[in-house]
């Protein structure tokens, strides 16, 4: 049982990486100014670090970076939506 659990813990975080990439892509589609956003820059930096960590089998660290990258992108999306709603209310 212990071997089975440790094997699960060392699997590459492929789904987390994919989720982060998709969330970053969605954020970029929402707003043309996304590239200049500190949140998106941080998300991309974390995703790059996750990719490097995955290459050297640091899967748990890579998983954490991918999750943080996705979180940064989600926070940007939430901010962009609130900005859009604020502009609509001003009209």
Residue ranges and their predicted role:
Residues 1-8:
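Sec-dependent bacterial lipoprotein signal peptides
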Residues 8-91:
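Long, charged/polar, soluble alpha-helical segments
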């Amino acid at each position: 049982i212990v071997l089975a659990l440790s094997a699960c813990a060392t699997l590459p975080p492929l789904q987390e990486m994919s989720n982060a990439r998709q969330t970053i892509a969605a954020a970029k589609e929402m707003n043309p100014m996304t590239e200049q956003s500190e949140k998106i820059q941080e998300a991309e930096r974390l995703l790059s670090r996750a990719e490097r960590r995955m290459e050297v089998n640091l899967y748990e660290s890579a998983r954490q970076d991918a999750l943080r990258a996705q979180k940064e992108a989600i926070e940007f999306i939430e901010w962009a939506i609130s900005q859009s709603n604020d502009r609509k209310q001003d009209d």
